Amino acid sequence: MNTAAASTSTPSRDALARFVLEGAAVRGAVVSLDATLRDILGGHPYPPALVRALAEFAAAAALLASTLKFKGSLVVQLASEGPVRLAVVECDASLGLRATAQWRDEAGALPADATLAVLVGDL
């Protein structure tokens, strides 16, 4: 089993922007976590498929935390018996992010575009 962990606060190069489509009942938000993801992922031997999953979890956590008014932390977590045993991303009310992951050796052989079902061994 392999394990890696990292934490960071929201750096200045990251961005979160809300938008409204005029004339339509559509509003949303977009997030860019370039610097934060570099800090979280850098220096850790995450398999490519796990890098993608952690990036998606971090974006989801940041978007959800930005729309909720709360004190505390929001956690996005995956736990499985598959190639990825555990992937956790935590986002606090100030949008600080941290992440950790544990994976089995076979996760390194997965393609970078492996689906979530493949990561959890649900095929």
Descriptions of predicted regions:
Residues 2-3, 11-122:
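N-terminal functional module of multi-domain proteins
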